[in-house]
Design a protein with these regions (language model features):
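Active-site phosphate-binding/coordination module
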Residues: 1-54
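Terminal peptide-recognition signature
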Residues: 8, 64, 149
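Residues at the C-termini of beta-strands that transition into short coil/loop
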Residues: 9-12, 110, 167-170
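Short glycine-/acidic-enriched loop or helix-start segments at secondary-structure transitions
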Residues: 20, 74, 148-150
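Hydrophobic, Leu/Ile/Phe/Ala-enriched alpha-helical segments that form helix-helix packing faces
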Residues: 37-46, 89, 93-101, 156, ...
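Conserved acidic, metal-coordinating active-site core of Asp-based
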Residues: 49-137, 145
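Mg2+-dependent phosphoryl-transfer enzymes with acidic/Ser/Thr/Gly-rich catalytic loops
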Residues: 117-119, 123-190
Length: 190
């Protein structure tokens, strides 16, 4: 897929490829006091299932998950999703982290995790690579305030671009086809 795109952004824009060449990588280290705080959150969570890696280091940030990032099955993920909806566990952990570490971006991401990075290093950082004349379209599933797609959706909108809330890759594909068809019609009408 990388070779079919001009540029690919991973890890909230902290890991960037042009073709197969890595052109930018932000190597950020999780501070020890933050790691200890995450370990305590894990220790005191009342959710009973634990699997795999709970603190996943990525370029430019960390993903934290009470359930774990590897070796989890669909049923376990669904159990955590239900638990989180009932208890707002991720929201509460994020709130505590933001209070204790105001120099961190803490955002709810995906179904089971929290994304942590230095303040200002959220997904909106990718806009540094675009011109004001570029037509921007962003697709995301977590666009509410405090979620990991919010900052980019807001920044794209402020630049006159478009953002689309999607449920999954199939929904993304459907919306992409719709945009493609609309652009084709507009070019024929002109």
């Amino acid at each position: 897929m990388y070779t079919k795109c001009t540029r690919v952004y991973n890890c909230s824009g902290s890991d960037v490829y042009e073709g197969t060449k890595n052109v930018y990588r932000d190597d950020w280290e999780l501070p020890t006091d933050v790691e200890r705080h995450l370990e305590n959150e894990l220790l005191f969570s009342k959710f009973p299932i634990r699997n795999g890696i709970h603190i996943e280091r990525r370029p430019g940030g960390v993903n934290f998950s009470i359930l774990g990032r590897a070796n989890t099955c669909f049923i376990e993920r669904e159990e955590y999703v239900k638990w989180d909806k009932l208890t707002n566990e991720r929201g509460e952990i994020a709130r505590r982290l933001r209070l204790k570490f105001p120099d961190l971006e803490v955002q709810i991401g995906g179904q089971t995790g929290l994304d942590l990075a230095p303040l200002g290093r959220n997904k909106s950082q990718i806009l540094r690579d675009f011109e004001t004349s570029d037509e921007l379209h962003f697709f995301g599933d977590m666009m509410e305030e405090g979620q990991n797609d919010y900052a980019l959706a807001k920044a794209v909108e402020e630049k006159g671009g478009f953002h689309y809330h999607v449920k999954d890759w199939m929904d993304t594909r459907t919306k992409l086809v719709g945009i493609s068809d609309r652009h084709l019609v507009e070019s024929v009408v002109k």
